[in-house]
Amino acid sequence: MAQSRRVEKVAALIRKEMSELLSNGIRDQRVNTTMITITEVEVSGDLQHCKIFVSIYGNEIQKDEVFSGLEASQSFLKGELGRRLQMRRAPEVVFKLDRGMEKGISVLNLLEKLEAERNIKDKKLIEFQE
């Protein structure tokens, strides 16, 4: 259980430091063009691997461009994390694109469409009965 708490604390620290680095530390213009949100950080039990899930605001072209900038900055970010967290070995950083918000919005749109279709059917049924 203690190891689990340690992993959670390290994940929280990585999230905090990575947020700071993404907003102020990267000079790559591709990364600075739009808003990036860190949605989740997963750290392995041995603290050697770190998956950072990001949500990127913008269209698909912008997202691809920003994501390629993040991937190009991985080694720099790993070094900065190691310095800031003062860890013996900084974890390998891997970025993953989180499409949860997009999927949630598409589900909501489908539900709204179904509700509209149902309302139309109910309205036609009421008109038919009159």
UniProtKB/Swiss-Prot annotation:
A GO-annotated cellular component: cytosol
Lineage top rank: taxon: Bacteria
Keywords in alphabetical order: Cytoplasm, Ribosome biogenesis
UniProt xrefs under Gene3D superfamilies: 3.30.300.20
Molecular function terms from GO: ribosomal small subunit binding
A GO BP entry: maturation of SSU-rRNA
SUPFAM superfamilies: Ribosome-binding factor A, RbfA
Localization (cell): Cytoplasm
Cross-referenced NCBIfam families: rbfA (TIGR00082)
Functional description taken from the UniProt entry: One of several proteins that assist in the late maturation steps of the functional core of the 30S ribosomal subunit. Associates with free 30S ribosomal subunits (but not with 30S subunits that are part of 70S ribosomes or polysomes). Required for efficient processing of 16S rRNA. May interact with the 5'-terminal helix region of 16S rRNA.
Annotated family: Belongs to the RbfA family.
Subunit structure and binding partners: Monomer. Binds 30S ribosomal subunits, but not 50S ribosomal subunits or 70S ribosomes.
Protein name: Ribosome-binding factor A
Organism the protein comes from: Prochlorococcus marinus (strain SARG / CCMP1375 / SS120)
Gene: rbfA
